[in-house]
A protein has these predicted regions:
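C-terminal amphipathic helix plus adjacent low-complexity
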Residues: 134-183
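Short hydrophobic alpha-helical runs that function as membrane-insertion/retention elements
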Residues: 47-49, 103-104, 125-127
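Short amphipathic alpha-helical segments
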Residues: 31-34, 60-61, 95-98, 115-117, ...
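A donor-sugar binding/catalytic signature common to diverse glycosyltransferases
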Residues: 68-117
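Donor-nucleotide binding loops and adjacent catalytic segments primarily
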Residues: 1-82
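Short, surface-exposed connector motifs at secondary-structure boundaries
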Residues: 16-18, 96-101, 152
């Protein structure tokens, strides 16, 4: 989307920036959570927030923070220096495909699995949900300054780009279907 690209490039000056998104996760007391987060976000450090279902927003405008609405993660994540998210399978996959390091803050279900996998693969870290607003600043600094994590994220994206996930999924479904017909 050309309009998204224009808005982000004007805001970022062409630099990669941290991106915060919680996808379909919603929170109780979102305003209070965001206030805790903004109180600890490093002064002068730019950030892109995708509002998502959580309705992440600012109580007042901040020149260093851009809040955007619905947009494809595949479009958005290429502008990221680090992706801060909940660890949903789709968001994790999009960040892996984009070749960007991740900070995962899992909330429930398989999000803990994806956080462990990203950490095991060396392309990101996990922060515990309870204190994430207070810990996010140092975590972003750590991940952005980790040459190893950046390189591993790029390496994983290169591997994923050689795979044809759709074709493989169709093949597996066809095999499963034909096995069920033979029963």
């Amino acid at each position: 989307d050309a309009s998204l690209e224009k808005v982000i490039n004007e805001f970022s000056g062409g630099e990669k920036l941290p991106i915060l998104t919680f996808g379909s996760v919603s929170f109780d007391k979102t305003e209070k959570l965001m206030q805790r987060f903004l109180n600890k976000w490093p002064e002068g450090k730019k950030l892109i927030i995708q509002a998502g279902w959580a309705g992440l927003s600012l109580l007042e405008e901040s020149p260093g923070i851009l809040v955007i609405g619905k947009v494809s993660h595949d479009q958005l994540f290429r502008y990221g220096s680090v992706i801060i998210h909940h660890g949903g399978a789709g968001t994790t996959a999009s960040a892996l495909h984009a070749g960007v390091s991740q900070i995962i803050i899992p909330h429930f279900g398989d999000q803990f699995l994806w956080a462990r996998e990203v950490r095991r693969l060396g392309s990101g870290i996990r922060i515990r949900r309870r204190k994430w607003p207070e810990r996010i600043g140092p975590a972003v600094s750590f991940v952005e300054n980790s040459f190893q994590m950046k390189e591993k994220a790029k390496e994983l994206a290169a591997i994923l780009s050689t795979e044809d996930g759709r074709r493989n999924a169709v093949r597996e479904l066809e095999l499963l279907h034909s096995a069920n017909i033979k029963r």
